[in-house]
Curated annotation (Swiss-Prot):
Acts as a decoy receptor for TNFSF11/RANKL and thereby neutralizes its function in osteoclastogenesis. Inhibits the activation of osteoclasts and promotes osteoclast apoptosis. Bone homeostasis seems to depend on the local ratio between TNFSF11 and TNFRSF11B. May also play a role in preventing arterial calcification. May act as decoy receptor for TNFSF10/TRAIL and protect against apoptosis. TNFSF10/TRAIL binding blocks the inhibition of osteoclastogenesis. InterPro entries: DEATH-like_dom_sf, Death_dom, TNFR/NGFR_Cys_rich_reg, TNFR_11, TNFR_11B, TNFRSF_decoy_receptor. TNFR-Cys repeats lie at residues 24-62, 64-105, 106-142, 144-185. The keyword Cell membrane does not apply. It comes from the Eukaryota. Residues 198-269, 270-365 form the Death domain. It is found in: Secreted. This is Tumor necrosis factor receptor superfamily member 11B. The record marks 401 as: Involved in dimerization. Residues 1-21 form the signal peptide. One of its GO terms (biological process) is negative regulation of osteoclast differentiation. Gene3D superfamilies: Death Domain, Fas, Tumor Necrosis Factor Receptor, subunit A, domain 2. Disulfide bonds join 41-54, 44-62, 65-80, 83-97, 87-105, 107-118, 124-142, 145-160, 166-185.
Amino acid sequence: MNKLLCCALVFLDISIKWTTQETFPPKYLHYDPESSRQLMCDKCPPGTFLKQPCTARRKTVCAPCPDHYYTDTWHTSDECLYCSPVCKELQYVKQECSRTHNRVCECEEGRYLELEFCLKHRSCPPGFGVLHPGTPERNTVCKRCPDGFFSNETSSKAPCRKHTNCSAFGLLLTQKGNATHDNICSGSSESSTHKCGIDMTLCEEAFFRFAVPTKLTPNWLSVLVDNLPGTKVNAESIERIKQRHNSREQTFQLLKLWKHQNKDQDMVKKIIQDIDLCENSVRRHIGHLNLTFEQLLKLMESLPGKKVTTEDVEKTVKTCKSSEQLLKLLSLWRIKNGDQDTRKGLLHALKHLKTYHFPKTVIQSLKKTIRFLHSFTMYRLYRKLFLEMIGNQVQSLKISCL
């Protein structure tokens, strides 16, 4: 009896494996009335419907689905499925209807589908951070910030951030943070000014880039070196600049080094004074923005080339005043991307920020800054300080290169 039972189980196992074994094209059992036999017919592929089942003399006949109809699997149906109608309010077409798939609708950025409605993602209040960001299918999941972490903003994307380690910045803990506030460190304003040093401001970069001719002659850099007043940049430094940077970037790097070597000269002090006036204008455009940590991070991600890291953004937020944070991060980006032009980088970022639903006031302020850095005001400053300073010889050379 046991032997018979074992044989039956083995036979059943073999039968199951045979019937479930994958074949291509997939098959199905069909009774053929002509031959009075059960036949293994081919199923119809996606994008078609079953027009005629197979017979002993003919294979399965499939026909294409008509417009606005589809099938998305191998099947045995004699009709196609009708595509879903147009998308609902606050949805967009993620995938259009075709013969092989249905129309796919999805809620707009920042919303998720609940029953038949696209609802706005939940924003986590101060003291709570995002555990799971919202998707088109589910709402944001918030979690109370644990000990040692905080969130001081209402956001649908920002997680809890770790309290500042004051000692890591050489500061003393004045007031311990909680779920809604960061630690407060003593001497933060004085130390921030020092630690938030910006390698080169936007105005300095724009000013020095105006000195780069549209078309460069082979001896442009040599003529510039010979005509710059004050302490000359040595040959070793010039050679290093030539090896590390492309031809257009070389002029910018040379002027940056020359300015550093002659910072005590009256002519350079005059340049710095006028550039400071320019910086005041830039700060009027972007110094008041008070971007959140999340917004600063998204802006850095939108810039081309090598990225400023999350750790860099965190450190900048903790050591720089709010009016200096964006300028500092742009300076860090430029350092990471040696030959990149910050103004062009911002132009690239603006195209992407629009898709992230970035605040319009921020985008408008960035646009104004970009226009200002490439305006006649900057060119006039360049002519006043640079061309007059290095003389008519270099001016003639630059004009002949334009």
